[in-house]
């Protein structure tokens, strides 16, 4: 399986299932994650996390605060992979109502791990 498809499938499944061990295994040791939720969840000034320890703390705390209705984890099965870049969307409209519109943007390293992960939010 191509690395982009592997990340697309495995990241989504692990996130839905709150499997933080499986999630962090998809990231390179020196990965960066940027999200507007970082300051809210971790009480930091910056929205950028670096390395497994910081990213795992965010994933664990974020997972423990669910469930909520902002994300229904609906995707339409489409993603864009160009070289080492991977992009997909959780669209606003779902078959069961609406969810927050999220765009996942990831850069993969030579080993197929997530090197940089940026999360962009729409409105909710």
Label each region the model flagged.
Residues 1-29:
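Short, low-complexity N-terminal intrinsically disordered segments enriched in polar/charged residues
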Residues 2, 28-80:
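A solvent-exposed, acidic/Ser-Thr-rich amphipathic alpha-helical stretch
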Residues 6, 70-72, 98-100:
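Short solvent-exposed loop/turn micro-motifs enriched in small/polar/acidic residues
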Residues 23, 31, 51, 55, ...:
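Hydrophobic pocket/interface hotspot
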Residues 29, 95, 110:
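Short, ordered coil/turn segments that flank beta-strands lining enzyme active or ligand-binding pockets
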Residues 85, 99-124:
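Short beta-strand edge/turn micro-motifs at domain boundaries
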Residues 87-95:
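Short beta-strand segments that buttress and anchor functional surface loops
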């Amino acid at each position: 399986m191509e690395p982009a498809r592997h990340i697309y499938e495995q990241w989504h499944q692990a996130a839905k299932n709150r499997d933080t061990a499986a999630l962090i295994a998809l990231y390179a040791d020196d990965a960066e994650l940027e999200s507007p939720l970082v300051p809210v969840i971790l009480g930091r000034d910056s929205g950028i996390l670096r390395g497994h320890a910081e990213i795992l703390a965010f994933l664990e705390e974020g997972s423990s605060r669910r469930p909520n209705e902002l994300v229904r984890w609906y995707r339409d099965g489409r993603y864009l992979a160009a070289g080492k870049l991977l992009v997909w969307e959780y669209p606003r409209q779902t078959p069961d109502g609406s969810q927050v519109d999220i765009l996942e943007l990831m850069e993969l390293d030579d080993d197929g791990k997530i090197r940089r992960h940026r999360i962009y939010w729409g409105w909710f």
